[in-house]
């Protein structure tokens, strides 16, 4: 998993944090 992902739309995919992911 990821550490905490910051940002209003941040999410974790696999083991990488992304700034934005669609709902």
Swiss-Prot record:
GO terms for cellular component: extracellular region. It is found in: Secreted. GO terms for molecular function: toxin activity. Keywords: Disulfide bond, Knottin, Neurotoxin, Secreted, Toxin. Its main location: secreted. Expressed by the venom duct. Disulfide bonds join 2-12, 5-17, 11-21. The presence of a 'disulfide through disulfide knot' structurally defines this protein as a knottin. This is Conotoxin Cl6c. It comes from Californiconus californicus (California cone).
């Amino acid at each position: 998993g990821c550490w905490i992902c910051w940002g209003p739309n941040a999410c974790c995919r696999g083991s990488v944090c992304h700034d934005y992911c669609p709902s």
